[in-house]
Design a protein with these regions (language model features):
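Transmembrane alpha-helix entry/boundary detector in multi-pass membrane proteins
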Residues: 12-23, 80-91, 112-117, 132-152, ...
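Juxtamembrane "helix-exit" motif on the non-cytosolic side of transmembrane helices
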Residues: 2-10, 68-79, 128-140, 192-203
Length: 239
């Protein structure tokens, strides 16, 4: 399933791996949605889906994607300490679980706890640090600057959007969140959609692994859902 590009040292996967990830995410997401539907039909006090339903579904799908991401990650270079590798994997899985919980809360229009939103932010801090350590020298960083910039945009979006989702935006938070949201939407789209197409059609001249491509794809969907669901909140002027 996994192959290595010897000229660059980067890993890439064929379309079978991509299809497998999509299959797992789709199955789990459908099961979760069916479970919600069953609970809503019973006499359980769960509010019906509100305008945040799309946001909740996108969070659940992103959460499932993050939770299973370590299963498809290739060996991280020896330049990254083993302890940091372990922390990255644990945080990614926990962040995935957090997003699933957040998705359920948004689906039923409940305000999430701020702690649930801190974990995904921390996972991207570690992800960014590991990405820096994976590349040796400034030339390696420069040649993959698009991936690093993308992670920075997503990290900024996760940090500032957490305040919006908790309903406690500070001064200028809305404008900053809106800026990072649009930057993240553009960068994740660039890092996912073209690479996804080339991966499926067997193009091996790509440097992003399939786990990174798919994570960016579902992050794109999440950011898009956030912009739609929270449009009023992030465009209001703080008096």
């Amino acid at each position: 399933m996994f192959m290595t590009d010897g000229s660059t040292g980067f890993y890439y996967e064929n379309y079978e791996s991509t299809s497998l990830v999509f299959t797992i995410i789709t199955i789990v997401s459908v099961v979760l949605m069916v479970a919600l539907s069953i609970l809503n039909k019973q006499n359980i006090k769960i509010a019906p889906p509100k305008p945040n339903a799309f946001l909740g579904i996108s969070q659940i799908m992103l959460g499932v994607c993050l939770a299973i991401e370590p299963l498809f990650v290739n060996d991280i270079p020896s330049t990254v300490p083993n302890a940091l590798k372990t922390i990255k994997v644990v945080l990614i899985v926990v962040a995935g679980i957090s997003f699933v919980v957040l998705g359920f809360l948004n689906f039923i229009d409940k305000t999430p706890n701020y702690i649930l939103l801190i974990i995904p932010t921390l996972s991207y801090v570690i992800r960014l640090l590991v990405t820096f350590l994976c590349y040796t020298g400034m030339s390696g960083i420069a040649s993959n600057i698009y991936e690093i910039v993308n992670l920075c945009f997503v990290l900024g979006f996760l940090h500032f959007s957490s305040k919006i989702l908790c309903g406690v935006p500070g001064k200028n938070t809305k404008a900053i969140t809106r800026t990072f949201a649009y930057l993240s939407l553009i960068s994740t789209s660039i890092c996912s959609i073209p690479n996804m197409i080339t991966t499926i059609f067997g193009n091996t001249n790509i440097h992003l692994s399939v786990d990174s491509i798919i994570t960016n794809l579902f992050m794109t969907i999440y950011v898009f859902a956030f912009l739609i669901s929270k449009k009023q909140e992030i465009e209001e002027t703080i008096e």
